[in-house]
């Protein structure tokens, strides 16, 4: 079977894999299985702990043996985890499945962005990321409508369907996904499997230590991870147990949460479209400025959501958080990929940023869960919002120096 062009496959995966299964999962766990705030946060902690342990090793696998293989394994694993979450009912089994999801996700993280960057080149990947984001919004909206429609009848069935879609996507990638940009070491230079993996890791580590902006990017990823876990795990519970949802029409909760996501994605679609038109004229400093702006919106909206008791204001705040995240992601991917000039370690370096985010989430998750249990969900959300503030300082530092860190640039590059 003839393989498709890389951009066609990438846009197709953005369309199919953007189905927001996590929305119906969150409502299912709170409404049907009655998870406590601590259990919800522990799920995230289990996921992030596995990401912390395996993010970089699986990135090394992708750089050593191929990004396509890594992605297929990852899609099969995350799809299986979603499907089983819809089958079992034990809280601790579900916590374990969240850990499995995290492990499978590490095979995707880094490898996904590295694959398309190598296929199209660093000079073209920025517009591809932005256009892919627009495909993901369309796929998410269509998928959300389908999942919400199914979820109003059975949340369990909607969760299972979301997992099945990922498994089907993995099987399609086996036959349709190309890989022409990746070059494995020549057979004459290959050594044992563990030796090859270790060589890739050491090369990536030296590259990061010698790249000042990458060190700062990893710091930002750590701070964002510290902040995000509270909102990711507690936003639905905050609405359902504290703030309440509008009663007009008596819509089920899953419909409301689906509507929030749809509105945010529609805004994101048009904002990203506007950015795409002038993106090729934007340098690193311009991207950092946009990231600073949307990070400020993210922090302010998350804090407002934590403190308000009004359903209307809470909805506006959640939309602010979701819109900021929608727009920031393709900008972040482009900014990071611009700094990774060595294709042979691209997936590993990208995985390092993912590992920093996971460390932040795993470290902050249990603490914020205890705060939410002891002092209320709003307190956990507020602390999470305040933890985002150091990221603004790091972005501001990058802006003052045109996207570079001059003090670090004076350090000598490590010898090989």
Predicted features by range, described:
Residues 162, 170-189, 397-409:
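Helix-loop junctions on the cytosolic side of multi-pass membrane transporters
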Residues 1-52, 212-261:
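Helix-loop boundary and gating motifs at the non-cytosolic
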Residues 50-53, 256-280:
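Transmembrane alpha-helices of Major Facilitator/SLC transporters
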Residues 51-89:
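Conserved MFS/SLC helix-loop-helix module at the cytosolic interface between two early adjacent transmembrane helices
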Residues 98-137:
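Cytoplasmic helix-loop-helix junction between adjacent transmembrane helices
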Residues 76-89, 295-309:
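C-terminal ends and interior cores of transmembrane alpha-helices
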Residues 157-175, 379-397:
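Symmetry-related core transmembrane helices of the 12-TM Major Facilitator Superfamily/SLC fold
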Residues 1-4, 178-217, 413-415:
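Juxtamembrane intracellular "pre-TM" segments in multi-pass secondary transporters
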